[in-house]
């Protein structure tokens, strides 16, 4: 997977990108978006 801005892709999933919003990381994963709190 790809890693940007301290982001890492989930194991077993393909993330096409990620963006850091305030205190959370938004993962652009197919087929849906997954949001993780940091």
From Swiss-Prot:
Tissue-specificity statement: Expressed by the venom duct.
Record's protein name: Augerpeptide hhe53
Domain comment in the entry: The cysteine framework is XIV (C-C-C-C).
Highest taxon of the lineage: Eukaryota
GO MF annotation, one: toxin activity
Keywords: Disulfide bond, Secreted, Toxin
Cell location: Secreted
Post-translational modification: Contains 2 disulfide bonds.
One GO term describing the cellular component: extracellular region
């Amino acid at each position: 997977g790809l890693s940007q801005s301290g982001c890492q892709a989930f194991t077993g999933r393909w993330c096409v990108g990620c963006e850091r919003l305030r205190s959370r990381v938004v993962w652009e994963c197919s087929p849906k978006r997954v949001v993780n709190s940091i």
